[in-house]
């Protein structure tokens, strides 16, 4: 198969309103540039996988979209809302799974989820929390402090927190990192549900096989720039490996 979009060109976003629109985004840490003029659009209901090696800027981009970091310049719009002006409203539309679990270690799973339920002013929070803890397999540990959890259990609770408020947009930053087999299988099931739903998803990873499994569009971020974008239907694993090597210089 031939990749759809040559390196450096913008891919056509499917018809429909852009759920995420990033324009000329830059981010520097001192004299070190993490993002160098990123342009990216993700349509409503689209599942985009963002590939890139370590240090490419994936986490920085996700943190900015999630309103956890500010760009040096450029703009981000979420469902038409300017992130710089309406960050609180935007956060209610986003669920985030990242390296930082955003959980309180001294609180129990119950207490963590009830805390976030209050932040989102969720109706019927108790019933919602019961159902989600059952779904992620943590009902029997719901009253134990999170600091006593294994890495896989923490990630399962992170997933529960991320989907608690039924967000329209899910951001998953290298979600498979450090997971045990049970947690990885559960996460794969969550991703399958997201792919079948009407949610907008960005998944970041450097694992080509995992990243291509459920997306309908892919992009490669390298050294702070989008080097390639294309439709999933127009690439297979072998051609994606070739494109990735051409863009990043890495296998």
What are these model-derived regions, one by one?
Residues 74-82, 90, 228-230:
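Conserved ABC transporter NBD signature motif
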Residues 170-173:
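Catalytic Walker B motif of ABC-type/P-loop ATPase nucleotide-binding domains
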Residues 114, 118-141:
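Conserved ABC ATPase "signature" region
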Residues 66:
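Helix-to-loop junction immediately C-terminal to a conserved catalytic motif
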Residues 51-53:
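The feature captures the beta-strand-to-loop junction immediately N-terminal to the Walker
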């Amino acid at each position: 198969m031939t990749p759809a979009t040559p390196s450096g060109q913008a891919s056509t976003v499917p018809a429909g309103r852009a759920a995420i629109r990033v324009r000329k985004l830059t981010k520097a840490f001192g004299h070190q540039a993490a993002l160098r003029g990123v342009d990216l659009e993700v349509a409503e209901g689209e599942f985009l996988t963002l590939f890139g090696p370590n240090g490419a800027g994936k986490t920085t981009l996700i943190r900015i979209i999630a309103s956890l970091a500010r760009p040096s310049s450029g703009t981000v719009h979420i469902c038409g809302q300017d992130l710089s002006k309406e960050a609180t409203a935007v956060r209610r539309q986003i669920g985030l799974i990242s390296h930082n679990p955003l959980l309180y270690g001294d609180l129990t799973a119950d207490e963590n989820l009830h805390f976030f339920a209050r932040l989102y002013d969720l109706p019927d929070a108790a019933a919602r929390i019961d159902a989600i803890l059952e779904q992620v397999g943590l009902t029997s540990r719901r009253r134990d402090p999170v600091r006593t959890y294994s890495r896989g259990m923490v990630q399962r609770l992170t997933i529960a927190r991320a989907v608690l408020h039924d967000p329209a947009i899910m951001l998953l930053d290298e979600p498979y990192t450090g997971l045990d087999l049970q947690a990885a299988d559960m996460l794969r099931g969550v991703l399958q549900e997201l792919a079948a739903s009407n949610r907008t998803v960005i998944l970041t990873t450097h694992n080509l096989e995992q990243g291509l499994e459920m997306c309908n569009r892919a992009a490669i971020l390298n050294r702070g720039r989008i080097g390639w974008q294309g439709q999933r239907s127009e690439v297979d694993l072998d051609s994606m490996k070739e494109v990735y090597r051409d863009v990043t210089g890495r296998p």
